[in-house]
Structure formats: C-alpha cells, structure tokens
Amino acid sequence: MQNYPPAGAPNYQPGGAPQMSPPLKSKKGWIIGGIVGCLLLIVLVVIAIAGFGLYVSKNLKSTQNTNVSAPSRAANTKQYVNTREGRSGKLADNFVDFSFYYPESWEIDDSPEPNFVRVERKLVDDDGGNFTQENFAVGWVSATGTALDKQLLPKLAAQFNQQFSAQFPNYKKVSEGETRIGPYEGYEFRFTANKNDVDFWGRVAMLPPPAGQTKGVALVMIASDRAPELSGVEDVGEKGELPVILDSFRFGSGASK
C-alpha cells in the first residue's frame, strides 16, 4: 500500500490541507494504511509551514550549542547522513548537514520530499496491513540572512498547532515549551489524537541551527498505541525505539563510529 504522496502530488502550503484517506481495516477492525497516509501527509504540511514561517525572522542570533561530542553507536543500528546528492529545489536550497542512528529494523525513505528523510517502525498484521508504531521525519527551517533564535520558535509552534488541529481527528495539544534533543536546545509541542479507537501521539521539536548557520531542523515524531512500550504522549521520544534516534542526532555530516 502506498502511504505517502506519489510523485507529482500537490505540495501543500499554509492554508492548503490534504484530505483524509479512507482507512482500510483488518479482520480485527484495526485501522491500517489510511491513517498512516494521513499522518505522513501532515508531516509534509508541517515541513512546508516550517520553511514558510521562519522566513520572517531577521537579526536574530543562534543560541545553539556548537561544541558537542560524537554520539555512541547503539547495537543493531544504521547511520543516516544527510547528503546533497540528488537534492533539488527547496531541499537543495535549504540543505542542512545532519546525521543520526536508527534501528536496523526500521524502514527508511530518504527522499520523502519535502522532508529530507523519514524512518518508520511498523507493525504488519496477518492481512498484510501495516500500522505506524513510531515515525520520525526531518525537515528544514530557515531564516533570512541570519540564524534562527529559539525566541521565534513559539510563533512557529502556533502555526503548527493550527494546522495539526485541522488535520487530526480529536486533536488536542497537551504541552508546549523548551526542550532538549541530545545536546541541543529547542522548542516543542506535543499532542494527542484518536481515530477509530486508535490513539496517536505526536511531538514536534524545532532546533535552531548552530552559530554561524541559518538553517535549523524540524523533527516530527508520530507514535501510536500499537507500540507496546508507549502508553501516552509523554512517552514519545522517551520510551520505545525513538530515543536511539534522538540521542544520536547531530548537526554536521557525521561519521560512522
């Protein structure tokens, strides 16, 4: 099942909204595929907003830590290093050097435009349907001429919140504030949603770029109650397998250890 927009699909901008895909169901009545497709479309909307919303910033200084240690490589992981190769359009213009480790069992899509990369942990049932258990995508955020400052990020979070509330069934923002992803300071919000008795939990973390750079990243995390280690939105990125990714995320090209 294709669960992301095909080549040539519309690039949704602020004010535009993807439509919900009709869900498929397994014999157990679980939602498969359709809600996953919706979530991935929403990730694309988020990144489009991110690229748009932060063009308004001017004369702000980055507060991001630039002296960080290399991450340790956990067992049974692969490294993703973002590359300019094959990039075009906005992804080329707004390229960000970053890397992270992710579990070998996760599926990777390294060209899910307008995101740089998306990795996903899935549960496949007996009917061949699949559920998103944990999902992680990286997009860019950019300032004009100067680096982003975390003081601007609450304004971006407000734009995100408006878009998510229009897209997710039974959406509710539950928290917002400063956060830390590995060695980096940032700003995040978390939310819950529910569709056909499946609970979804989301976390969007925005990281300003290191000093001297103008492009940061938006880390979009979606999880569901099909991940047995998770019991609520507070667990996203704290339990399950997402912490391996977050702890190893680094600005810069990275190198395998």
Segments and roles (model prediction):
Residues 2-126, 181, 198, 220-257:
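N-terminal targeting sequences that direct proteins away from the cytosol to non-cytosolic compartments
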Residues 73-76, 94, 111-231:
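Conserved polar/disulfide-associated segments of primarily extracytoplasmic proteins
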